[in-house]
UniProtKB/Swiss-Prot annotation:
Biased composition annotated in UniProt, kind: Polar residues: 153-163, 176-187
Gene responsible for this protein: RXLR8
GO cellular component assignments: extracellular region; host cell nucleus
Record's comment describing the protein's domains: The RxLR-dEER motif acts to carry the protein into the host cell cytoplasm through binding to cell surface phosphatidylinositol-3-phosphate.
Secretion signal span: 1-19
Biased composition (Low complexity): 135-152
Family the UniProt entry places it in: Belongs to the RxLR effector family.
Chain intervals with Basic residues compositional bias: 442-457
Protein name, per record: Secreted RxLR effector protein 8
Length: 457
């Protein structure tokens, strides 16, 4: 009789819990359940489904009202079938309480994997594939022992830890794989040929030889070690497309501090010195005066840089053997450069003198001056004086390296002498001898065929 009563109580409570589990609202599901167009499926085991949300576990547990109602129903059913004394009623009440207490803990829900889609299924939001584990269940040792028969097929903590570790490994591999693909895509856009890193002993030796060359010929400009390194780097980079001279100078000039700027101003001739003296007479703030001087020094340095640019490559070509023999590692230099490389470098310099490139330099100088004037908010008359000084520098911008024109017949008297080029640079430096013919081999063959010979008379 008692076995029949216990079986009836278990069937009643199990049926009620199973019914409530199958009637869950999709909006109240935890983040382990994902709603699709035609089904609802769980991403993990039912035990992990209940463990992921404490609120969900509390919703599935019977409330106090359900517990009292179940106990009363069980007692009424037992009273109809039991004819013993009142002591049996107390035993039945205790047995019912024990059954309710057992079912109050986490229980595996019976979710249907093929539930038809409802109106609220579209509002479900997919959660992360592997959410983090929450705190463990609050069941006691006796409760776990009581329900061990129902949880024998669940994952142990050791198994779950190994699964989590394997997931982290897979995630790390997938992320590293994506990073590898991204870096490969970036590498494909970079230049395939890279310039060699020049050791310090090579730079110092080339600088010593080139400085003696400049001093012997009295060219008027004395290069620094940094400038020699920049030109030497550009020389070794000749296997790829060379940079513009102005771009190399801008990148090199960016790292000038105030001390280097003061030393550099002494190498740029009297034109810049008089302009800077005019700026100093305006009584500008010290910070503004330094910022105003920098664009002018850059512009004047570009003219000096062009002359030194061509002369350096001529020096390297002529003194290639001397440079190679003076280095401890003779294999580094690899001998002299071919005429093709030299032509490419000089052709790049020729682009610096075209109309479009000169217009960009003029615009850059004006923009730099305007930025400084706006920053310090100077008076209109001071700003006008600084802009006029900038216009004087722009008018002096002309082709530094003169190209030799075809010789004309004596009868061509309509050409004005003022249009002829001189061999002097804008800052008063004599152009080196080899540079006067720098563009002779770059001229097109069509232009050479149009050259008329002199008359025999």
């Amino acid at each position: 009789m008692r076995g029949t009563l216990a079986t009836a109580l278990l069937l009643v409570i199990s049926s009620r819990v199973a019914t409530e589990s199958n009637q869950l609202d999709p909006q109240q599901l935890s983040n382990h359940v994902v709603g699709t167009y035609d089904k609802i499926y769980t991403k993990s085991s039912p035990r992990r489904f209940l463990r992921g949300s404490r609120k969900q576990r509390d919703d599935l547990a019977p409330t106090a009202a359900d517990e009292n109602r179940t106990i009363n129903n069980a007692i009424e059913s037992a009273m109809h079938g039991i004819t013993f004394s009142g002591g049996t009623t107390a035993a039945t009440r205790n047995a019912a309480r024990e059954v309710v207490d057992i079912n109050a803990f986490s229980k595996r829900p019976r979710l249907s994997l093929n539930v038809p889609p409802s109106e609220t299924s579209a509002h479900l939001i997919e959660a992360p594939t592997f959410p983090q584990r929450n705190s463990a269940s609050t069941s006691t040792t006796s409760d776990i022992a009581t329900s061990s028969s129902r949880t024998s097929n669940q994952r142990t903590p050791k198994t779950q830890a190994s699964l989590d570790m394997s997931h982290k490994t897979m995630t790390r591999k997938s992320s590293s794989k994506n990073q590898f693909k991204k870096s490969t895509a970036l590498k494909s856009t970079k230049r395939k040929v890279r310039a060699r890193k020049i050791p310090a002993f090579v730079v110092n030796k080339v600088y010593t030889l080139y400085f003696d060359h400049v001093k012997t010929k009295s060219l008027g400009f004395d290069p620094t070690v940094k400038e020699t390194k920049a030109m030497l780097s550009l020389y070794f980079e000749s296997s790829v497309d060379p940079f513009y001279v102005s771009a190399v100078l801008s990148n090199f000039f960016r790292y000038f501090d105030d001390k280097e700027l003061t030393i550099h101003k002494k190498k740029l001739g009297t034109t810049l010195t008089s302009a800077l003296s005019t700026l100093a007479a305006l009584e500008l703030p010290p910070g503004m005066l330094k910022e105003i001087e920098r664009p002018f020094v850059w512009y004047a340095s570009l003219k000096r840089w062009r002359v030194m640019y061509c002369d350096f490559f001529e020096f390297v070509k002529v003194n290639s053997d001397k440079i190679t023999n003076s280095l401890p590692n003779k294999e580094f230099y690899r001998g002299e450069t071919s005429d093709i490389v030299r032509d490419k470098l000089l052709a790049t310099l020729k682009k610096e003198t075209n109309t479009n490139t000169r217009y960009k330099r003029k615009r850059k100088l004006k923009n730099d001056l305007d930025d400084v004037l706006k920053k310090y908010n100077v008076k209109e008359e001071i700003g006008a004086a600084i802009r006029d000084l900038g216009e004087q520098f722009l008018k002096a911008d002309r082709q530094t390296i003169p190209s030799r024109r075809p010789t004309r017949r004596p009868g061509a008297s309509h050409i004005q002498p003022s249009n002829q080029r001189t061999d002097l640079t804008p800052h008063g430096l004599q152009v080196p001898g080899p540079e006067k013919n720098s563009y002779q081999h770059i001229k097109s063959k069509d232009h050479a065929r149009k050259k008329r010979p002199r008359s025999s008379s």
